[in-house]
Amino acid sequence: MYFCRQYQEEMMKKTVLYTLFLLFSTMVKAQDSETAFNFLRLPVSAHAAALGGENISICEDDAALVFHNPALINYVEDRTMNLNMMTYMQGTLTGAASYTQAINDRATWGLQGRFISYGEMKQTTYDNQETGTFRANDFALGGTFAYGLTEHISGGITAKWAASYIGHYNSMAVAVDLGMHYFNEESQWSVGAVARNLGGQIKAYEDDFERIPLDLQLGVSKRLIGSPLRFSATLVRLNDWEYGIGKHLVLGADLLLSEQFYVAAGYNGMRASEMKISSGDDTSAHGAGLSLGAGMTLERMKLHVAYGKYHVSSTSLIINFSYTL
């Protein structure tokens, strides 16, 4: 029995190592900014959203971080459920849910789902004559496995299926997220690497297949020893060098007031650039790119809240609630 268990652990370790090797060995061409399934770019974790909308390196008991780096579920308490709500554009409804469970001391699995409903919209002809209404919805389902490769390094993979419905048109896609994470408790350094949305459409809206939003990311976090301050820097869209380095950088800072409470703030250069609006001779992002948030832990319950801007027409509030059974 001992040798059987040891063999299974070695096989899991080799499988995860081989899969994660693809993260660094696959050369990816730059992709166009026009992609389908762009709702997969929206943040789910309120803590990550507060730190600029992208963070793959903080080491926290936060079940929603699996949407950002699958390796991070290894730090989540066994049998944890998480619910998410996000305000987005007017008339839309956005949410997500996840469940995480430990297999043993080194392995964890989880299930996730997310959706966005754009509500009812007017259907018009080319000459702007109304012909009725239609609805649009996006959603994705996924399963995650993570494994502790060493004392300090974990690897994870999420396989997911996504679908999009726009009136009587629909599209489907399959993809995987690959992630690695390093954490040293003594030095309080942590590093993450992620390849998100590796895959593509398996059914197009019409005849032409479109890309899905592939995103290669590298991040680092460091808590100052003896201080409540922790700083994070994340490089995003490393597969697309159409932009300058400043637009690829996401910065965030945590003030860890206690084990039960934190406040956070961040800045996302890419988001600020994409949402700039011109008015006469002036161009302004109107606060886009800046984000704030806070979180607290009460025994088995955790509550995280973040505020940011992810659409030119409105600001967003993200709320995570998790409970450990």
Label every model-predicted segment.
Residues 31-325:
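Subset of outer-membrane beta-barrel
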Residues 26-30:
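Sec/Tat signal peptide C-region and signal peptidase I cleavage site
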Residues 11-15, 151:
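Positively charged n-region of N-terminal signal peptides that target proteins for export
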Residues 6, 16-17, 34-35:
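Generic early N-terminus positional signal peaking at residue ~5-7
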Residues 8-9, 24, 36:
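Coiled-coil-like amphipathic alpha-helices with heptad-repeat character
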Residues 15-25:
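Sec-dependent N-terminal signal peptides
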Residues 1-11:
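Short, Lys/Arg-enriched N-terminal segments with co-localized hydrophobic residues
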